[in-house]
Amino acid sequence: MLRLDRVEISQGTFRLTADWQVSAGEKVAMIGPSGAGQSTLLMALAGFVPYAGKVLWQGGDLGPMPPGERPLSILFQDQNLFPHLTVAQNLGLGISPRLRLGAEDHARIETTLQRVGLGGMGARKPGQLSGGQIGRAALARALLRARPILLLDEPFAALGPALKAEMLDLVAETAAETGATVLMVTHDPADARRFAGLTVLVEAGIAHAPQPTADLFANPPPALQAYLGQ
């Protein structure tokens, strides 16, 4: 279980609170106006932004853990692939920052690339990949870390509708296989409906408790109605 226990983020005049929990294996969307704090909340969970309160995973407090030791991986919108390295090397950084990789490591990398539909492409550089393939490579890097929590900060926002839907389905499929808990920031209600069983509305300084996605959009509160232009 992922528990946000009276979490409060304060940055100058910005303030965001969250006090809720989700079961392991859930797929959760976070939606709200730009600047409401969805991405900031992800950064706090990852350990990059200070916060008050506690973030608990399976009962253990993540607060004392540095970002690299937290049980999570994060995908950003820009994917953060190094252009001068091959795809395999980009993945390998998640195993060894100095790329000291053995035969077993290389086999794991290739297996993970095959899993996301990039088998045999490890020798290519990011500049030789399409937008969708870059997204798949970034997802493969996150999967290779084998962390139980996956945070998505709109990593597929720049893709067209069909390709974005394909990537969301791929994430959902791999999450189901691994049992990962996924939190996804999105500004697109269609993405939330397609991907997430639960949705968190972030507005007016509060990340509200997750609600069933279908119910939330069927009966949106005033703040969500305003965001949706209803």
Predicted regions and their residues:
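ABC-type ATPase nucleotide-binding domains, specifically the catalytic core motifs of the NBD
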Residues: 50, 65-66, 85, 89-106, ...
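ABC ATPase NBD coupling module
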Residues: 61-78, 97, 102, 216-220
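Conserved ABC ATPase "signature" region
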Residues: 103-121, 172-173
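Conserved ABC ATPase signature
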Residues: 125-129, 133
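A short, proline-enriched helix->beta-strand linker immediately N-terminal to the Walker B motif
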Residues: 144-148
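Catalytic Walker B motif of ABC-type/P-loop ATPase nucleotide-binding domains
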Residues: 150-154
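Conserved beta-strand-loop-alpha-helix hinge in the C-terminal portion
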Residues: 206-229
